[in-house]
Amino acid sequence: MEQSSIIKINPADSVVVCLRPMKKGETIEVDGKTITLLQDTPAGHKVLINDAAEGTDILKYGYPIGHAKTGLKAGEWVNENNLKTNLAGTLEYTYNPVDEQLKIAKENRTFKGYVRKNGEVGVRNEVWVVPTVGCVNGVAEKLVELLKKETGCEGIDAIHAWHHNFGCSQLSGDHENTRKVLRDICLHPNAGAVLVLSLGCENNQPDDFMKMLGDYDHDRIKLLVTQKVEGDELEEGMKILRDLYAQAKEDKREDVPVSKLRVGLKCGGSDGFSGITANPLVGEFSDWLVAQGGTSILTEVPEMFGAETILMNRCENKELFDKTVHLINDFKEYFLSHGEPVGENPSPGNKAGGISTLEDKALGCTQKCGRAPVSGVLQYGDRLETTGLNLLSAPGNDLVAATALASAGCQLVLFTTGRGTPFGTFVPTMKISTNSNLAKNKPNWIDFNAGALVEGVEMKDLVSKFIDKIIAVASGEEARNEYNGYREISIFKNGVTL
């Protein structure tokens, strides 16, 4: 059997990953030993390379991904049926800083972006309608329909309404989270102009909400309270939108250094190849971007469980370490407060793709942020303040997490997937496939194929092409989700509904 049929990710690992479906009785050569497979094993799944007694930790990526439920033999297929998570409740952590310097040359790369009055840079120039409450979603959609029909979107990239179900019947922190995300959307540099659309009687009171925007561009962000309109709110809304559109239409792209890029890092529909191909590829890009003075953000906090100490020890200082500890333990408390185990994460699709425990998933997930030091930690709804690698508090849910990344200020999101997904958030959401079969079967979903990494293509060559692709999308090339019209927002609900 050829070595290319398997991969051992870390020298310390007690499993290898199959790069193709393998049959019972086939043999593999690992560390000078010949091992016979004891079961048929799908591609992306794990095979044990040493006997393991019950309770023995099983290592992948050089770290435990759980322990053996029973005694296991070398050659066995390791999956959720014989592997159990080690995760439990909150933990105490010790700061053991790791200072790894990135040895990546700085390049004078640019992209063509829209420089806003406040100095922020957008990769799109769009007109948005942002409802303060779900009650006016229909009005928002109708206004967008009318403006599209009247203008054909000529001279801008898109016109869109970001409908949601919130803005009323919420209390305390839950209500505040909604307000913060909607504020962040209104202030996003991918918007050339925004109509804030209010009903008037909602909990998210329009005047208070507008104060949250701070020192905003009053020419480019306008408010319409529909209950205050005497007559047709559509007619009044169109008057405002025509003016906003006319202003946005005058904006032009210009060369901007890549240091102005803010990129979100996300995975969903992950499989056993995610931590081998797409996530390391995105990690290489993240390191490159940070070395250029740019910014990347990693979220999906529950999918850090089991890999969190790696991130904690990469924090630039003790203050950031403490914030990361709270980031992790606060989310564990969130699970426990609902009576749910912290390790109950891998989905049926994850398991079918070769991910058996949350540690298995987390150690692959965190490959997306490369090796750069952690320079910032953000709470849900916070806007970026620090360049470099940031961590953001948000759940693993694809729609919620991607919206949170964009709300924090990311102009685009890199989304790795092994199973495939069509969705996109309110910024370009590039899909990177972990395997070539997905890229071949779903070219209408996938922007870039990382599966080539297990087919003989060198990482440095693929990273170069990946950088070119991202710069092209940042400069105006449509991501597949944009081409398909798959764009939406989802806000994290964490509280009672009145």
How would you label these PLM feature ranges?
Residues 2-412, 419-422, 427-498:
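Metallocofactor- and cofactor-centric catalytic cores in central/energy metabolism, strongly enriched
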